[in-house]
Structures are given as C-alpha cells and as structure tokens.
Design a protein with these regions (language model features):
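A C-terminal cap/extension of S-adenosyl-L-methionine-dependent methyltransferases
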Residues: 141, 186-238
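A conserved beta-strand element that flanks and buttresses the S-adenosyl-L-methionine
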Residues: 112
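A short glycine-rich, Lys/Arg-flanked "PGG" loop and its adjoining helix->strand segment in the class I
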Residues: 126-138
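Acceptor-substrate binding/catalytic loop of class I
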Residues: 158-174
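Conserved class I S-adenosyl-L-methionine
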Residues: 1-43, 47-56
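Conserved beta-strand signature within the Rossmann-like core of class I S-adenosyl-L-methionine
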Residues: 139-146
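Class I SAM-dependent methyltransferase SAM/SAH-binding core
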Residues: 57-101
C-alpha cells in the first residue's frame, strides 16, 4: 500500500480493522499488547531505544512504551496523516517519516516491524530490510511480525479488509530468507492463536510456536556486533 492509500484510511484505521476482524477485533489493544510483550520476552527489558517501523497511528507504540518504560520509543511511517494521529495519541514520542527524513543510522537497539512487509511489493522487500539494518545498532535486533498465509481465517480477513487490498502475504520461509540476508537469525515461530474472546488460553502460545496455524508469525534477527554504528545518541536516555 502506498502513502496516499494509508493517508486515505488514517482517520478510520481502527474502525476499519474492527469491521474487518468482526468478533476477533473487539479489543485491538489485545493484539498490540501481545506483540509488545513478545518483543520484551525476546530482547529483555533493559534496551535503551526501540523503533516501530511502520507505526501507523501509533497503537503499538503505546504498548511498547508500557513494556519498555526506561527506553526511548520512536515510530516511523510513510503516511503523514497516520503520523499526525500517532503524535496526538502519544505525546512526547518522536515520530518521523522516512520520505522526509533520512534513516537514523545505528540509532536503535531494536527495530520492530509489525505487519509491514505484506504491504511492500515483493521486489522492494530487500530494500526495506536494508533500511532497517542501517537503523539497528551493532548487536541490536530486528523483529518482524507478519500474517500467516496458511491460516484460512487470516486469508479471509485480509481478503475482506480495505487496508489490505494490495497486500501480498508472505510465508515464514520468505521472511526468514529476507532477515537472514543481513542479520543472524535468533528466533522465529507462530503466534496469535487465541483471539480476545479466549484470551485466558493465551498462556499456551509459547508451546504452540512451532505449529503453523497461528494467525501471525515472528522473526528476530541480530545485527553483527563487529559492525560500526555511524551516529545517534538514541540509546542514551537522559
């Protein structure tokens, strides 16, 4: 999806998601909380800076701030309308557009890209990973989340969601290849097995990560420690 398309839907983004998800979308924060907690589980809670790449209207940023209260949390997106809403909902957070500002090289301990790549044309995905790589500090992490195309319910939701009208879902194997090209793979698995209505079963998710039926999957990669970061004081929160 291009920047103008995201701008078109920014004001009604959450409402569109709720309508597309139906009974699965009654608590959108549930999904943001689950992602943020999984990120914390993978990288620990002592990082100095976290960027959400493709932050939209900032829903995940709010949850990341709760999970990483001592870290600087930032967000970037192509959609200026979405960024405007994100700033209004998350005062004090730095949001920026990659179309207007250069990437902050080596600026973050972790870059999280939740459900971004399926909106990117397949022949442009390597470039996105390259951009994220430049923004991650040596020893830092990339963490991506993507819809699982092998889940029939996910495919139905994506098919009926205006936000995903140009989406091209990618399987875990493709995401692993994309991340492996620039990072050392650290973790991957399936997640989002239980919607809000049965959230009491979510404690089972770690034992199901191997099962390719989850609504989404995650991949974590680590940037080589021997690389040299070029700039930024993002990791030093004062």
């Amino acid at each position: 999806m291009s920047r103008p398309e995201f701008d078109e839907y920014a004001a009604n983004y959450d409402e569109i998601r709720k309508q597309s998800l139906g009974y699965l979308g009654k608590d959108l924060d549930y999904y943001a909380r689950a992602k943020s907690r999984l990120v914390r589980k993978m990288i620990g809670g002592t990082v100095g800076s976290v960027l959400e790449f493709g932050c939209g209207i900032g829903s995940n940023v709010a949850q990341l701030r709760l999970e990483f209260p001592q870290a600087i949390v930032a967000g970037c997106d192509l959609s200026l309308e979405s960024l405007s809403i994100a700033r209004a909902h998350n005062p004090g957070v730095h949001f920026f557009s990659l179309s207007e500002e250069p990437p902050i090289k080596g600026g973050f301990d972790a870059v999280v890209a939740p459900n971004v790549l399926h909106h990117v044309a397949p022949d442009e995905r390597d470039h996105v990973i390259d951009t994220i790589y430049e923004m991650v500090q040596p020893g830092g992490s990339i963490i991506i989340f993507e819809h699982n195309p092998y889940n029939p319910l996910v495919r139905r939701v994506v098919k009926n969601c205006p936000l995903d009208r140009n989406a091209v879902l990618l399987p875990l194997s493709e995401s692993l290849s994309l991340v492996r090209r620039r990072f050392t793979l650290s973790a991957h698995g399936y997640t989002t097995f239980f919607p809000p209505l049965v959230s009491h079963l979510a404690f089972l998710e770690p034992w199901l990560a191997w099962l390719p039926l989850g609504g989404q999957y995650y991949v974590r990669g680590i940037r080589d420690q021997q690389c040299t970061a070029t700039d930024s004081t993002w990791g030093n929160k004062s």
